[in-house]
């Protein structure tokens, strides 16, 4: 079977699972947590989502394109990976600092849930899916995602039992993102030459900033469109309507 067919198969299975699992969790969470608590979750997640955007910028698209273009040259690909990821670390750390400032200075309620949503930004800090997308290794990313998704569903069913467990639900979802991305680092030495990190310098990082930002602008518009409704409902209406 060709690589293209295998990748298509992995993606198809993942999409089916991605569609099926919410059919299990959504009715359960609606009954156990209720609309108000789910509204709190949606609102705080939407706020954290803006900081995830700041952390990632256009790295997923730009990183995938760059790696795909030079994947036949392992030396160049390895160097590019560490340069792009170094930039990603900087933007993610900046985003985390700003989010902490938001929690301290602006956030007046649901602080614990908001803090736990912050793990989504940590997840963005260690998100190197774009490396594996670039080398067309969908088996690693899809298999890992499926295992994590099934695990989170099991944990939700076992641990989330009442509206007071909103923080547990939030922790499961956000920590799942961190764990899912952290697992990928085990496979990095199998894809790139780790010694290439020694060749990374400021000039090498700077050359990736402009093309990254170019791809970020349309992504920003699309992403804000998808999460703005939850933010506006949470800010101007009730959490119950947001949920």
Please report, for each region that a protein language model flagged, where it lies by residue.
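Interhelical loop/hinge segments that connect adjacent transmembrane helices in multipass membrane
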Residues: 1-4, 139, 166-170, 182-227, ...
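Alpha-helical transmembrane segments of multi-pass membrane proteins
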Residues: 54, 93, 100-132
């Amino acid at each position: 079977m060709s690589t293209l067919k295998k990748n298509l198969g992995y993606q198809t299975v993942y999409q089916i699972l991605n569609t099926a699992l919410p059919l299990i969790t959504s009715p359960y969470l609606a009954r156990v947590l209720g609309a108000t608590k789910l509204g709190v979750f949606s609102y705080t997640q939407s706020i954290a989502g803006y900081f995830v955007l700041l952390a990632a910028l256009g790295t997923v698209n730009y990183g995938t394109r760059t790696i795909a273009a030079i994947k036949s040259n392992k030396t160049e690909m390895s160097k590019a990976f560490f340069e792009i990821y170094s930039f990603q670390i900087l933007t993610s750390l900046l985003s985390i600092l700003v989010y902490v400032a938001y929690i301290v200075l602006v956030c007046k309620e649901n602080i614990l849930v908001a803090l736990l949503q912050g793990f989504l930004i940590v997840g963005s800090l260690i998100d190197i899916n774009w490396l594996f997308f670039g080398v067309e290794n969908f088996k690693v990313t899809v298999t890992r995602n499926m295992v994590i998704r099934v695990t989170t569903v099991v944990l939700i069913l076992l641990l989330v039992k009442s509206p007071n467990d909103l923080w547990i639900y939030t922790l499961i979802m956000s920590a799942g993102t961190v764990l899912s991305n952290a697992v990928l680092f085990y496979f990095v030495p199998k894809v790139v030459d780790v010694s290439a990190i020694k060749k990374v310098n400021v000039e090498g990082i700077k050359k990736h900033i402009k093309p990254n930002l170019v791809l970020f602008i349309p992504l920003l518009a699309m992403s804000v469109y998808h999460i703005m409704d939850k933010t506006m409902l949470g800010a101007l209406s009730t959490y119950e309507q947001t949920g």
